[in-house]
């Protein structure tokens, strides 16, 4: 997605050798115009998949996921990273390691929101090592639902997340694919949409 790549170049900051900070439009402050465009692109990419639910993980995946769900006209569910006292029964869980935060969390979704008839599109802000998406896939499979694809706003293609997900038989669609970081700059490779 050319518009997204241009925005990353304009407003993204490379930190070290493998961190991209995009807090001015995605991970802290949200540009809803850009998110709406992102939602439309993912909806077009999965228009024929019969998606019934969009699933993400809190927190930075929520903004793009809401706009994808809006464009597909389906509900959006986000996995919670912290146990809520109101979630007392029928909980689907998985362990997820965060590359950015360097911590493992138990994420959960109430089972009443997913059924064996659901066709799910997972949406997330970043793909690095694939652990967040893998955890969401585990939760969706616990419900007996099917994963139709994983939509990623920004993929760090130099890390092994895509390979992990494709080895699991999951279609990955990334709107911006970063080939590498070089001298504080980033290089893109061809995106999926």
UniProtKB/Swiss-Prot annotation:
Superkingdom of this protein's organism: Bacteria
Q: Which GO terms describe its biological process?
A: purine ribonucleoside salvage; xanthine metabolic process; XMP salvage
Where's it found, cell-wise? Answer: Cytoplasm
Enzymatic reactions: XMP + diphosphate = xanthine + 5-phospho-alpha-D-ribose 1-diphosphate
Which residues are recorded as binding xanthine?
20, 27, 156
- Pathway named in the protein's UniProt entry: Purine metabolism; XMP biosynthesis via salvage pathway; XMP from xanthine: step 1/1
Which InterPro entries does the record cross-reference, listed alphabetically? PRibTrfase_dom, PRTase-like, Pur/Pyrimidine_PRTase, Xanthine_PRibTrfase
Q: Which UniProt keywords apply?
A: Cytoplasm, Glycosyltransferase, Purine salvage, Transferase
Main subcellular localisation: cytoplasm
Question: What GO terms fall under cellular component here?
Answer: cytoplasm
Q: What is its EC number?
A: 2.4.2.22
Q: Does the keyword Kinase apply?
A: no
Protein residues bound to 5-phospho-alpha-D-ribose 1-diphosphate: 128-132
- Entry's Gene Ontology molecular function annotations: xanthine phosphoribosyltransferase activity
CDD domains noted in UniProt? PRTases_typeI
Concerning its family, UniProt says: Belongs to the purine/pyrimidine phosphoribosyltransferase family. Xpt subfamily.
State the function annotated in the UniProt record. Converts the preformed base xanthine, a product of nucleic acid breakdown, to xanthosine 5'-monophosphate (XMP), so it can be reused for RNA or DNA synthesis.
Entries under HAMAP family matching the protein: XPRTase (MF_01184)
Q: How does it assemble?
A: Homodimer.
Name of the protein in question? Xanthine phosphoribosyltransferase
| Source organism per UniProt | Streptococcus uberis (strain ATCC BAA-854 / 0140J)
């Amino acid at each position: 997605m050319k518009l997204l790549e241009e925005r990353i170049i304009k407003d993204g900051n490379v930190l070290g050798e493998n961190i991209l900070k995009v807090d001015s439009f995605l991970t802290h402050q949200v540009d809803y115009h850009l998110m709406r465009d992102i939602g439309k692109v993912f909806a077009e990419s999965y228009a024929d998949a019969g998606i019934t639910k969009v699933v993400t993980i809190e927190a930075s995946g929520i903004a793009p996921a809401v706009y994808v769900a809006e464009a597909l006209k389906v509900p959006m569910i986000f996995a919670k990273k912290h146990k809520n006292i109101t979630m007392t029964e029928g909980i689907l869980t998985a362990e997820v390691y965060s590359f950015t935060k360097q911590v493992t969390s138990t994420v959960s979704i109430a089972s009443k929101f997913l059924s064996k008839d659901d066709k799910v599109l997972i949406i997330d802000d970043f793909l690095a090592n694939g652990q967040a998406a893998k955890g969401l896939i585990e939760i969706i499979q616990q419900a007996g639902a099917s994963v139709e694809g994983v939509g990623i706003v920004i993929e760090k293609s130099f890390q092994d997340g895509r390979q992990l997900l494709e080895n699991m038989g999951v279609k990955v669609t990334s709107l911006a694919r970063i080939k590498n970081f070089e001298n504080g700059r980033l290089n893109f490779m061809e995106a999926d949409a």
